[in-house]
Design a protein with these regions (language model features):
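Core RecA-like ATPase module of SF1/SF2 helicases and allied nucleic-acid translocases
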Residues: 1-127
Length: 127
């Protein structure tokens, strides 16, 4: 599990850095990577900005090789080899975080503000 502290304005850029690391360093097929967030506005920003040059698509619009970027609510019950859970604030509830984090089979990255990553590293309540 990797925790990446990010200020809200830099969350999408941090996702790009982590995508590059997962694809290049860990050699994970982009089609086996899922980017999840609790907020539709952040999901839409990630899709629009193609962080790190990686195309991120909606579940229903994905093509071979696309990274899926969705809200945690939409992906409940589905898994991928690698998952990046990203938020620009620390108000995601423990249950929602757990659902997002539990989608990862082998690699999990959490990108968020210091308060969130610190709480998770300490084994925050309910996590």
């Amino acid at each position: 599990m990797i925790f990446v502290t990010s200020q809200p304005a830099h969350a999408v850029a941090k996702v790009g850095e982590m995508l590059e690391e997962l694809v290049v360093e860990f050699q994970i097929d982009p089609a086996n990577i899922l980017v999840l967030t609790g907020h539709t506005a952040l999901r839409d920003r990630i899709r629009a900005e193609s962080p790190g040059g990686f195309a991120c698509a909606a579940w229903e619009d994905r093509h071979d090789g696309d990274i899926v970027c969705e809200t945690i609510h939409r992906m409940k019950g589905l898994e991928r080899d690698a998952v990046i859970v990203v938020t620009a604030d620390d108000d995601l509830g423990d249950h929602l975080l757990y659902v997002g984090m539990s989608r990862a089979v082998s690699r999990l990255v959490v990108v968020g503000p210091r308060a969130l990553t610190t709480r998770l590293q300490a084994g925050g309540p309910g996590i």
